[in-house]
Design a protein with these regions (language model features):
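Alpha-helical transmembrane segments within multi-pass membrane transporters and channels
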Residues: 99-148, 297-302
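Transmembrane helix-bundle core of multi-pass membrane transporters
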Residues: 140-208, 258-267, 311-321, 334-352, ...
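Small-residue faces within membrane-embedded alpha-helices
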Residues: 21, 25-28, 55-58, 62, ...
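Membrane-interface helix caps of multi-pass small-molecule transporters
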Residues: 67, 91, 96, 123-136, ...
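Helix-loop-helix "hairpin" substructures at the membrane interface of multi-pass membrane proteins
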Residues: 110-118, 125-129, 185-260, 385-414
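Cytosolic-side transmembrane-helix boundaries in multi-pass membrane proteins
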Residues: 1-29, 33, 227-234, 305-414
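Transmembrane alpha-helical segments in multi-pass inner-membrane proteins
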Residues: 247, 258, 262-329
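Single transmembrane alpha-helix segments in multi-pass membrane proteins
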Residues: 31-32, 44-101, 124, 131-138, ...
Length: 414
C-alpha cells in the first residue's frame, strides 16, 4: 500500500471509528430508555462490568482474527482453538498434579506450566495453518475449516481419555477447583489489562512497524507485495500464529471464568463473532484495510447490541444472539462496500431477483418480530417492510430512467 493510497484508507478508518463510537452511544441510550427494569439506571456498575467482561473476552481473540483479515486471510478455527487450548491447559494441570486438581490446590508453578502449554499449542496450530496455506497450497478457508472441526473433536477425545485415566471414569469435561486459577479468569480487571496490553502491542505492530505495513501490503495485493521483495509466507506465518495465540489466551481465561473445560460448548460459534467484530470495526474481508481501534470498537458495539437485546427481551435473549450478529455483519459489510465503491446510484432491487429479495426480507423481518412479540406485530412489520422496499424499488427505477434520459439528451446535443 503506497503512502497516497494509505491516506484515504486512514480517513475511511477514522470515519468508521467515529461512526461506531456514535452507534455505541445510541445503542446504550436506547437500551436505557426501553429497558423496563431500568438496569442501566439502577445498576450501572454491574451492567458496565458485564459489558466490559464480555467485550474483553471477545476482543482478545478478535484482535488476532483482525490481523489475519487485514493480511488477506481468514481464520475460521478461533472458537475451536479456544476450546482446544482450554482443554490443554486443564489437561496439563490434571496430568502434572491430579490430586491437587481435586482438592483445589494446584499451585502457581503448575498453573504457569499449563498456561505456557496452552499458548505453545496455539503457536503450533498457527504454524500448521501457515504451512497448509503457504506450502501445501490450501485456501485459508479450507485449512482453517478443517481445524475448526478437527480441534474440537480432538479436545473431546483428550478430555475423555484423561478423565478415564486420572479420575477412574470417562467424562466430557474437566472441573477446575483451584481458587488462584479461577481468580485469574473471573477478575475483570486482569482480563481487561491483558486486553488493553494486547491491543496496544498489536496496534503498535500494525501502525508503526515495517512488519505492520507489510501486512497491509500483503492484504492489499499479495502478488505486488511478493514482487516488491516482501516475505509474504513469513507474514502469513506471523498472522496465523498471532491469531491462534490470542485464541489460546482467551481459552485459558474462559476456563478460569467458567471453572470447567468443556470442549463441547467452550468457544462454540466464537469464530463468527470474532470475524463479525473485525468486519464491523472496519476490516475488509478482501484484505488490506482495518485498524486495531476499529476492531476494539466493533467488539464493544456487538456486545452493547447483544446486551441491549438481553435487557429488552428479558427471556430467551441468547436464542436471538445469532441472527442479531448476522444482521449486523451483513449491514456493516454492505455499507462498507457501498462507501468504498463510490457507487451512490447503485440499484439494489432491479429485476426479478430484486423482487424476490423484497419478498424474502419482508418475511424475515415479520418472522423475527413474531418470535420476539406476537403474530400481529410480525404481520405489521412484514407489511411495512414490503411497502418501504417496494417504494425504494419504484424510486430506483425512476432515478435510473431519469439518468438514461439525461445520457440520451447529452449524446443528442453533442
Amino acid at each position: 500500500m503506497t503512502v497516497d493510497a494509505a491516506k484515504p484508507a486512514r480517513r475511511f478508518s477514522a470515519t468508521t471509528e467515529s461512526g461506531l463510537a456514535l452507534a455505541i452511544v445510541v445503542v446504550l441510550a436506547v437500551t436505557a430508555l426501553v429497558d423496563s427494569n431500568h438496569s442501566y439506571w439502577f445498576r450501572p456498575q454491574a451492567c458496565a462490568t458485564d459489558i466490559v467482561r464480555q467485550t474483553v473476552m471477545l476482543g482478545i481473540f478478535a484482535l488476532g482474527s483482525a490481523v489475519v483479515i487485514i493480511s488477506g486471510g481468514i481464520d475460521l478455527s478461533t472458537g475451536s482453538m479456544i476450546a482446544f487450548s482450554g482443554t490443554i491447559c486443564a489437561t496439563v494441570m490434571m496430568v502434572v498434579d491430579p490430586a491437587a486438581m481435586n482438592t483445589g490446590q494446584v499451585g502457581t508453578a503448575t498453573i504457569v506450566v499449563a498456561i505456557a502449554a496452552a499458548l505453545a499449542v496455539g503457536l503450533l496450530v498457527g504454524s500448521l495453518h501457515a504451512w497448509l496455506i503457504t506450502v501445501v497450497g490450501l485456501p485459508a478457508f479450507v485449512a482453517t475449516l478443517a481445524t475448526l472441526v478437527g480441534l474440537r473433536s480432538l479436545a473431546r477425545a483428550i478430555v475423555e481419555n484423561v478423565t478415564a485415566e486420572f479420575l477412574g471414569g470417562r467424562s466430557t469435561q474437566i472441573q477446575i477447583f483451584d481458587r488462584e486459577f479461577r481468580y485469574l479468569g473471573r477478575t475483570v480487571w486482569i482480563s481487561a489489562m491483558l486486553f488493553i496490553l494486547l491491543a496496544v502491542l498489536i496496534g503498535i505492530l500494525m501502525r508503526y512497524t515495517v512488519v505492520g505495513r507489510h501486512l497491509y501490503a500483503l492484504g492489499g495485493n499479495e502478488q505486488a507485495a511478493r514482487l516488491s521483495g516482501i516475505h509474504t509466507d513469513r507474514l502469513k506465518w506471523l498472522a496465523y500464529c498471532l491469531s491462534a495465540a490470542c485464541a489460546s489466551l482467551a481459552g485459558v481465561l474462559a476456563i478460569g471464568e467458567q471453572s470447567v473445560a468443556d470442549p463441547q460448548t467452550l468457544g462454540r460459534g466464537y469464530e463468527l463473532n470474532a470475524i463479525a467484530a473485525a468486519v464491523v470495526g472496519g476490516c475488509s474481508l478482501q484484505g488490506g484495510v482495518g485498524t486495531v481501534p476499529g476492531t476494539v470498537l466493533g467488539c464493544l458495539f456487538l456486545r452493547a447490541v447483544i446486551d441491549g437485546i438481553a435487557k429488552i427481551i428479558k427471556t430467551g435473549a441468547d436464542v436471538h444472539e445469532g441472527w442479531i450478529v448476522g444482521i449486523v455483519v451483513v449491514m456493516a459489510v454492505a455499507f462498507s462496500q457501498w462507501r468504498a465503491s463510490g457507487q451512490r446510484g447503485k440499484q439494489f432491487f432491479t429485476g426479478a431477483l430484486g423482487s424476490l429479495a423484497i419478498v424474502t426480507l419482508g418475511l424475515i423481518a415479520g418472522t423475527l418480530v413474531t418470535l420476539m412479540a406476537d403474530w400481529r406485530a410480525g404481520s405489521a412489520t412484514a407489511a411495512v417492510t414490503w411497502v418501504v422496499l417496494i417504494c425504494a424499488k419504484i424510486w430506483e427505477n425512476r432515478v435510473a430512467v431519469g439518468q438514461r434520459a439525461q445520457g440520451a439528451s447529452g449524446e443528442a446535443t453533442t
